[in-house]
């Protein structure tokens, strides 16, 4: 059995004296310098305190260096940073806001009409089939928009993509735009999901008709800015 190495007792304390270079106390136990020098002569592995003594001894032999002072950045020295903007978002954003502004203003006019006029719900079409015929032949009017409820608006919008006819698409597009006036500031998740599906259908149907795509953009503006559907910027 190999004999154990005799080691000199080390004198240490848990809080060392101030270091001349850093003006701070050592975080490790303070070891006597003579003991450290003796430990360096051994070829066998050092124990924990001997290792610390070795590191201290080597650190004292290192050539000191001076770090260059970094000048604070000024307006002239800060490099220009390229803004990362999604493709098309920069130019498309003002257009959606413009449409939303129209919707907000017309929505206010509709509310004023509702407050100042006597409303008659009996003039409304009775079912979806009657709504389909009505929308194909008549332009939107305040009297109808004032009395139609949100549930009916959502139901019509959900059906409109399958009702679209080339001969009636201009009138149908007007109704889509005007139905946006009826959309409230707050809407539950299920109804928002319905509107997202409507937008997707409009974007994939009759894409060569500017009036229809304009109305789809109006719905998109409401979804993006009023209901926080930011992923629809480029839909």
UniProtKB/Swiss-Prot annotation:
Residues 1-34 are annotated as: Disordered. One of its GO terms (cellular component) is nucleus. The modification Phosphoserine is found at residues 117-118. Coiled coil: none annotated. Its main location: nucleus. GO terms for biological process: spliceosomal snRNP assembly. It comes from the Eukaryota. It is found in: Nucleus. Gene3D superfamilies: 1.20.58.1070. InterPro entries: Gemin2/Brr1. Pfam families: SIP1. Residues 24-34 have a biased composition (Polar residues). Keywords: mRNA processing, mRNA splicing, Nucleus, Phosphoprotein. The SMN complex catalyzes the assembly of small nuclear ribonucleoproteins (snRNPs), the building blocks of the spliceosome, and thereby plays an important role in the splicing of cellular pre-mRNAs. Most spliceosomal snRNPs contain a common set of Sm proteins smb1, smd1, smd2, smd3, sme1, smf1 and smg1 that assemble in a heptameric protein ring on the Sm site of the small nuclear RNA to form the core snRNP. In the cytosol, the Sm proteins smd1, smd2, sme1, smf1 and smg1 (5Sm) are trapped in an inactive 6S pICln-Sm complex by the chaperone saf5. Part of the core SMN complex at least composed of smn1, yip11/gem2, gem6, gem7 and gem8. Interacts with smn1; the interaction is direct. Belongs to the gemin-2 family. This is SMN complex subunit yip11/gem2. It comes from Schizosaccharomyces pombe (strain 972 / ATCC 24843) (Fission yeast).
